[in-house]
Amino acid sequence: MLTQVADGVWVRQSEWVWTNSIAVRGEDGLILIDPGIDGSELNQLADDVDRLGIPVVAGFSTHPHWDHLLWHPRFGDVPRYATPAAAHVANEARERAQAMAAESASGIPLELIGLVAPLPADGGPVPG
């Protein structure tokens, strides 16, 4: 379940491992940070986001480990970002991340893993 930790900030801790999914409200909607970590938890996170009633406008991966590159179709076809270095690694090692996810967790939409673009070099604008 998403827990509000500050105005416009919600956190959901994985039941499987100690990792957090974060939702931050911007002017236009939510930015999802590191959504995860298996198919069941991605569905639960999508349910939580639906209950908020705020559209997802972007995603962000904090680093290029497979469990931080996940996405779910229910979050929408929105831009997904990482730092330039993380986006480069994610794109170069996408097949490996998909294989690791398939070995480690179930129900993950493997085709959506690692589809991140580098943040704009000038720092903006980013949806949200």
Sequence positions of predicted segments:
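Short, acidic/turn-prone active-site loops that include or flank metal/cofactor-
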Residues: 37-38, 84-88
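Active-site metal-binding motif and surrounding structural segment of the metallo-beta-lactamase
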Residues: 40-82
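Conserved beta-strand hairpin/beta-sheet module of binuclear metal-dependent hydrolase folds
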Residues: 2-47, 51
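Residues at the C-termini of beta-strands that transition into short coil/loop
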Residues: 13-15, 84, 127
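Metallo-beta-lactamase
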Residues: 4, 88-128
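Surface-exposed, flexible loop/turn segments at secondary-structure boundaries
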Residues: 17, 67, 86-88
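Short loop segments at secondary-structure junctions
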Residues: 27-29, 78, 85
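Short, well-ordered coil/turn elements that cap or connect secondary structure elements
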Residues: 6, 51, 75-77, 120, ...
